[in-house]
UniProtKB/Swiss-Prot annotation:
Stretches assigned to coiled coil: 209-252
GO cellular component: cytoplasm; nucleus
Organism classification: Eukaryota, Metazoa, Chordata, Craniata, Vertebrata
Gene Ontology MF annotations: ubiquitin protein ligase activity; zinc ion binding
Subunit (UniProt): Interacts with PKM isoform M2, but not isoform M1; this interaction may compete with that between PKM and FGFR1, and hence reduces FGFR1-dependent tyrosine phosphorylation of PKM. Interacts with IRF7; this interaction promotes IRF7 proteasomal degradation. Interacts with TRAF3; this interaction promotes TRAF3 activation.
GN (gene name): Trim35
Name of the molecule in the record: E3 ubiquitin-protein ligase TRIM35
């Protein structure tokens, strides 16, 4: 028998691993070199960069520039040579050398799908694999490679989701930086207003005290001047009297009648005038309380604020957080609390106990909702809206059955109607309310709506509400004019003074 051609020993394992891409772990295909010196398949490194915001090396993470990829001809030639040797019978396949079956020393040509084991023909006859599905290695490898390809696609999509989420967190961080600066300015402005008010009140109180001191000082000086003049007049009279007493008896007695009349008309000393001391009580008595009461007259208070973190992209909340307009959709920082499928937002407070009331000025808005939403229902509605995508209707999931209780203005073929979130309820009134009063009795399970201008009851819901937050919907304005706002009305603050017993 004629000997076959001699086969040179294959390359070492470490050398073969140097020719594997660090991304796909296959021999290089169109090898390229990055600026950092690492090598990859061109397709692999490009695929990694598709899901990165900033291209970087998959191994060392050094920043990379896609335009600076250099084709590595040496690596490509080495891989081509070794693959050609494989085709000619070389032992290297790019992964591991074929191994025979340990039990039968026969070539492994089959694969048990149930046990996930490589088999030879003798293993197939074993009782352990009699009822199992067995396929040729080549066919199984092809099927598994297809599954891995699908898995690779799933992983790439997951990586894209991770990078998108990372970009969202980056946007949130930047938003918070801007918001922190803005909030610091607003907080300082509000405290400056309080300090200005206190400075004005302090100066007014000090000025009033000094004015009283000036007047009382002038009065005391005037009294002292009068007393000085009267004292001087008495001194002259005393001197005259002394001179008359030195006269001879006849002359002295002749002047006695006029002297007596003159002495009788001298001024008597007036009693000390009351109220000349500074009135400390007038200025110090409950000073802080009196200033605080006066401050209440200039301070505006609302039962709650409009939460901008829940406002959908259509809405813009005013800086004082008491009014909102619909200015058309604009991209906002994503967060789980924000409405995504409708121009809605929530109030800042959570109500679960006690009695609460507030008034809302809806004016002539063509489309609105005012009411409450169960906290858990809001979270569930947001999750369902996210699953449904942007194509959802503005009214999706926002009804009484899903934990939303409200009055709304809707547009119909025969005009506008005032409706409730209960679809089984008929239209309430013909005259559209412009200012609504909402009264929530948590323990009683009642949510009532009133027309504040007409002083009439509109509707009452009866339910176990649980934890709720004020809920609002604001449709787009009609016409080309500036958008009309929805406002939370200010409270009328009163003070009740009681004796602490």
């Amino acid at each position: 028998m004629e000997p076959g051609p001699s086969v040179s020993p294959g390359p070492s394992r470490s050398f073969k691993e140097e020719l594997l891409c660090a991304v796909c772990y296959d021999p290089f295909r169109d090898a390229v070199t990055l600026r950092c010196g690492h090598n990859f398949c061109r397709r692999c490194v490009s695929g990694c960069w598709e899901v990165q915001t900033t291209p970087s090396c998959p191994v060392c993470k050094e920043r990379a520039v896609p335009g600076e990829l250099r084709t590595n001809h040496t690596l490509n030639n080495l891989v081509e040579t070794l693959l050609r040797e494989e085709a000619e019978g070389a032992r290297w396949t790019g992964r591991r050398s074929p191994r025979p079956c340990r039990a039968h020393r026969a070539p492994l040509t089959l694969f048990c799908v149930e046990d996930k084991e490589l088999l030879c023909c003798a293993c197939q006859a074993d009782a352990r694999h009699q009822e199992h599905r067995v396929q040729p290695i080549k066919d199984t490898a092809q099927d598994f490679r297809a599954k891995c390809k699908n898995m690779e696609h799933v992983l790439r999509e997951k990586a894209k989701s991770f990078w998108a989420l990372r970009r969202t967190y980056e946007a949130i961080a930047k938003h918070n930086e801007v918001q922190t600066t803005w909030l610091e300015g607003r907080i300082r402005d509000e405290f400056d207003k309080l300090r200005d008010f206190l400075r004005v009140e302090e100066q007014a109180t000090v000025d009033a005290m000094k004015e009283e001191s000036r007047k009382k000082h002038l009065l005391a000086e005037e009294k002292m001047k009068q007393l000085a003049e009267q004292t001087e007049a008495l001194a002259r009279e005393i001197e005259r009297l002394q001179m008359e007493m030195k006269e001879d008896d006849m002359t002295f007695l002749m002047k006695h009648k006029s002297r007596k009349r003159r002495l009788f008309c001298t001024v008597e000393p007036a009693p000390l005038q009351p109220g000349l001391l500074m009135d400390a009580c007038k200025y110090l008595e409950s000073l802080q309380y009196r200033v605080w009461k006066k401050m209440l007259g200039s301070v505006e208070s609302v039962p709650f604020s409009l939460d901008p973190n829940t406002a959908a992209g259509w809405l813009k909340v005013a800086d004082d957080l008491t009014s909102v307009i619909n200015h058309g959709y604009r991209v906002q920082v994503e967060n789980p609390e924000r409405f995504s499928s409708a121009p809605c937002l929530l109030g800042s407070q959570v109500f679960s106990k006690g009695s609460h009331s507030w008034e809302v000025d809806v004016g002539g808005l063509p489309s609105w909702r005012v009411g409450v939403v169960r906290v858990q229902a809001h979270a569930q509605a947001q999750a369902q809206a996210d699953v449904g995508g942007e194509g959802h209707s503005h009214s999706c999931y926002h009804d009484t059955r899903s934990g939303f209780w409200y009055l709304c203005r809707t547009q119909g073929v025969d005009g506008d109607h005032c409706m409730t979130s209960d679809t089984a309820t008929a239209p309430l009134v013909q005259a559209m309310p412009r200012r609504l009063r909402v009264e929530l009795e948590c323990e009683e399970g009642e949510l009532s709506f009133y027309d504040s201008e007409r002083h009439c009851h509109l509707y009452t819901f009866h339910a176990h509400f649980g934890e709720v937050r004020p809920y609002f919907y604001l449709g787009a304005s009609r016409g080309d004019g500036p958008p009309e706002p929805l406002r939370i009305c200010h409270l009328r603050v009163s003070i009740k003074e009681e004796l602490d017993i």
